[in-house]
Amino acid sequence: MGLCQSAEDKELTLKSKAIDKEMMQNHMSQQKVVKLLLLGAGECGKSTVLKQMRILHDHGFTAEEAEQQKSVVFNNTLQAMTAILKGMEALRMTFDKPIRENDAKFVMESHKMLQEAKVFPEELANAIQALWNDKAVQQVIAKGNEFQMPESAPHFLSSLDRIKLPDYNPTEQDILLSRIKTTGIVEVKFQMKSVDFRVFDVGGQRSERKKWIHCFEDVNAIIFIAAISEYDQVLFEDETTNRMIESMRLFESICNSRWFINTSMILFLNKKDLFAEKIKRTSIKSAFPDYKGAQTYDESCRYIEEKFDGLNANPEKTIYMHQTCATDTDQVQMILDSVIDMIIQANLQGCGL
């Protein structure tokens, strides 16, 4: 009899907890807004993650918004070739075909052509494509870590046949890869599992960080994004500082800040696709001279994870790490679903459930 009563009590307790949990989720949906803060150094991929959240949970981009992105894509395409030409000069490389010098001069003087452009100018597109097909330009791209080459350069420059068409409309991938510097605060709102989320992206370059303080109050979780592929690159705003080291310094200050003692900390080691290619050519020793492991993806990535984890001064705080490719919508969806589930559970536990 006692055993039967115990089993009944257990079942009643489980039902009670399930009801409590459902009531709390309903309560959260009515009164609780979960605030997420996206942090990271400049060009780590925060804005791309935010765009993915819009695609996955906020109905994506309207036709009007896609149309507005055309000018960004046009400028990114021109900026990509301009950066490569500056890189060629810095590396003292010459064109395979000397006639390309005329195209280079034309491109470097063409920024005003895009100011009001509704269609990518044909003459400019032809010059960029001629340069893109030059063997020396392809060799410079392989040395992109030695100068400030946009990571989207190969995508946009190889897509000019499509981008220059009169009826061109940016694809989802074009929008994900397009970039303008984030200044101030960008917000995305969405609802998932009956919970309202507000996600903030703030400027990652040094001059923007003083503005982060306005986002700090009542933050439920931080998604810190570090570009794992940038271990051999320097900052845009300070070419004496390694990007990976800067990212680790920033992570340490955020992770151990008094503002975030009770805040869930999620680390996205982003651009894993670029890291996988780069590690075949260049060891992480450029950022970590003490590294003794093999020049492989798994071992190098594990070492970097341990480095970040070691920056956490609170033994009771767990850093939830994920290796990500922010431009891969399917992978981002899987990781974001896992992260959001974890955040919801953490909030329920915080309410005693």
Curated annotation (Swiss-Prot):
Biological process (GO) annotations held by this record are:
adenylate cyclase-modulating G protein-coupled receptor signaling pathway; cellular response to cGMP; dauer larval development; defense response to Gram-negative bacterium; determination of adult lifespan; G protein-coupled receptor signaling pathway; negative regulation of gene expression; phototransduction
Region (G1 motif) residue ranges read 35-48
Region feature G3 motif, mapped onto this chain: 197-206
Where is a lipid covalently linked (S-palmitoyl cysteine)? C4
Looking up InterPro entries in the UniProt record yields: Gprotein_alpha_I, Gprotein_alpha_su, GproteinA_insert, P-loop_NTPase
Q: Give all residue intervals belonging to the G-alpha domain.
A: 32-353
State any GO CC term: axon
Q: Which GO terms describe its molecular function?
A: G protein-coupled receptor binding; G-protein beta/gamma-subunit complex binding; GTP binding; GTPase activity; metal ion binding; olfactory receptor binding
In the UniProt record, what gene is named as encoding this protein?
gpa-3
Assembly, per entry: G proteins are composed of 3 units; alpha, beta and gamma. The alpha chain contains the guanine nucleotide binding site.
Q: Does the keyword Lipoprotein apply?
A: yes
Could you identify this protein by its name? Guanine nucleotide-binding protein alpha-3 subunit
